[in-house]
Amino acid sequence: MIYREVLPDKTLATSINCFWMIQASEAEALRDRTFPDGCQEIIFNVDTDVLRNDGHGYFSNPAVELVGQMTRPYDIVTRGRQTFFGIKFYPHSFSLFTDYSIHELRDQSIDVRDLLPDGFQAVVEQVLARRDFSYFVHSMTRYFQQLVSAIDITSRTYHLVDQSVRRIFLDKTSSIESLARHLNVSERYLQAAFKLHVGLSPKQLWKMIRFQRAFQYLDNPATPLADLALACNYYDQAHFTHSFKSLAGISPGEYRATAAPLNQHFLNKTSHAYLCNYRTGV
């Protein structure tokens, strides 16, 4: 299975984290679990059926889907050629491109053609016909460049959220009180701004970012969980295990023993598609 990433050009660097691709050499069926990562993404499931378990059974995801902010893990089954093209946004940046409530899109997989302005459908048809990752990156870049050129990203609320996300990524804050104080706004205003642009509270995003940091240590079975907890700024191992399980649905030990045929590509510490907190250029 091949995994590739392409970073956006400078015109999109503050709104798109990266473009990514997964492609297998032959058709197969896979099972995996997806975890909350604080970001939204568009995924083209090319010649691949994706079923997601929402707790009431498995349901088919759209061929071209927006994966809204996740607040819990989801088990998935994929069948077919295992070809996926993706666009990973920052926690707040997809809000620039749609009039829909980001908060209302949480924990949903939605046909993204229903969310974006006219013109996207034609681009989708061309991408699905070509089935070429380079063409996908080129087409999506042109489309979102056109959207960005017509968007006002200077609003006070968006700028405030952008500053907040940067500080959370850089681990410069650990509470909404300190974050609001640094930005000279009320906690209520900051909470409302996050709900509008991120779909999560600052506390939820901070929890997810810290959760992500654990994976670079979990890949090494020789790292004791107590040491991992301290490295990721948890109070102790018990606190880490409880927090991890609330977002992963399994314990750290169970995760180490579980196969992740798709997630393994995103959880690598060099990946931009999942571990976006390691980038400081947001």
Give the role of each language-model region:
Residues 205-208, 234, 238:
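Conserved structured core elements
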Residues 1-162, 166-177, 183-187, 201, ...:
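Alpha-helical bundle regulatory/interaction domains
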Residues 179-180, 190, 214:
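A general nucleic-acid interaction/assembly signal
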